[in-house]
């Protein structure tokens, strides 16, 4: 079981107030607001979690689960920028890698909006270890509103993963979206987010 040590205090406080993770829009907003105050959390801290899995995609992976890991792109010299710590929801796997949505390419509020839209594909509303989003590229294209997923859609190579994968517990999804865990190289996050905006607005 993924240990929820970073968010445990927030989870306990929320439950005491009657908020159940993921159960309602009000509940999700409360947990996001509390998590947004954790501005000093570093991605390296998550890498120390118990229960991290090996750094290769395997049959224990399922689309619609959320992971944090460290990545070093193969052709980074030719990329305009990249994120060294993707926060990725898995979409599909390949023999040499995998594809997913890296939420870091959107600012926190837009990450939350994208996640809200994808909740329509939840396999259950328990937000427990078995909860995942029944996600596919075809389903992403059916989401209402602007295609926020487009700048987030990335493909990764197994051999370029530089850490174990940390699976994010579903009860934490709404909170971790608010944290500044991205580590962009070559551009500041604000510039990356501006580029992403031009993509989902159809101007690039």
Language-model segments: which ranges?
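Mixed-charge, Lys/Arg-rich low-complexity intrinsically disordered regions
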Residues: 2-67
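Hydrophobic beta-strand residues in large extracellular and virion-surface proteins
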Residues: 67-69, 88, 100
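Short beta-strand-centered aromatic/proline hotspots
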Residues: 76-95
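N-terminal intrinsically disordered, low-complexity, charge/repeat-rich segments that act as generic
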Residues: 1-28, 178-204
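Hydrophobic beta-strand signal
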Residues: 65-76
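Intrinsically disordered, low-complexity, charged/polar segments
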Residues: 106-204
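Short, solvent-exposed secondary-structure boundary/capping segments
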Residues: 96-104
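Generic structural motif
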Residues: 72-74, 93, 106
């Amino acid at each position: 079981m993924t240990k929820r040590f970073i968010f445990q205090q927030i989870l306990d406080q929320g439950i005491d107030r009657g908020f159940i993770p993921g159960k309602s829009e009000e509940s999700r907003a409360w947990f996001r607001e509390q998590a947004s105050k954790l501005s000093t959390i570093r991605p390296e801290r998550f890498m120390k979690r118990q229960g991290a899995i090996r750094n290769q995609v395997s049959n224990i992976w399922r689309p619609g689960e959320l992971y944090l890991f460290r990545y070093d792109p193969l052709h980074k010299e030719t990329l305009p920028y990249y994120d060294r710590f993707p926060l990725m929801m898995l979409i599909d796997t390949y023999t040499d890698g995998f594809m997913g949505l890296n939420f870091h390419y959107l600012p926190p509020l837009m990450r939350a909006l994208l996640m809200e839209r994808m909740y329509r594909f939840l396999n259950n509303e328990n937000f427990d270890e078995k909860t995942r989003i029944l996600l596919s590229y075809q389903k992403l294209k059916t989401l209402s509103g602007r295609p926020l997923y487009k700048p987030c859609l990335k493909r990764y190579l197994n051999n370029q993963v530089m850490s174990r994968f940390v699976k994010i517990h579903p009860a934490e999804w709404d909170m971790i979206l608010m944290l500044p865990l991205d580590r962009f190289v070559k551009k500041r996050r604000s510039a990356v987010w501006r580029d992403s905006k031009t993509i989902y607005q159809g101007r690039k």
